[in-house]
Amino acid sequence: VINGMSGAGRIELDNQAAKSRFYISGDNSSFTGELVASGLNNNPGSTNDARDLQFATAASMGRGTLTLNGRGFWMDAVNTADTAVMATINVLEKGTYLNGGSGKSYYFGGAFTGSGTVTTALGDAFAYLTGDMTGFHGAFTRTGNALFTWAFGNNTAATLNDGKLFGDGVVLKADGGTSLFKFSYT
């Protein structure tokens, strides 16, 4: 359990035992450093080997960078556009897995960077991604058997780099179930 982070340094979470998770709570909005979670789990979110990060709220994620390399993450509390995650999500080659409760929607207002795959098996849910996507070169995908919507923008202004919304090579796909990819920019 981590309850309270602040400052601009780097926190690297150690590998943990299978079927365990780090629980991070409190309002960590003053944390502007980097929280790194990488290691053993090459199948983030696997029920046989869950080693994910559980955040109490969007504010528990801080306002720095969350670097994920083979670790899943989720939030206890559903957030809104007004309480969006403001941390930068940096996804490395082993990828990450958005876990949580089906039927819930999550809002991410921070940037996405890196070249890994962000996947989820959540059903009947939305992930609103309203931050800068120009530094992201990976993939957004969905596994499972229900509908999931990746919503880029939420009637918000788009950040573009040389006219591009994403970095080169981004892939939007459904590996199972049904994925919708919506774009809503002003």
Please state what every model-predicted region is.
Residues 1-186:
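Beta-strand-rich extracellular passenger or scaffold domains
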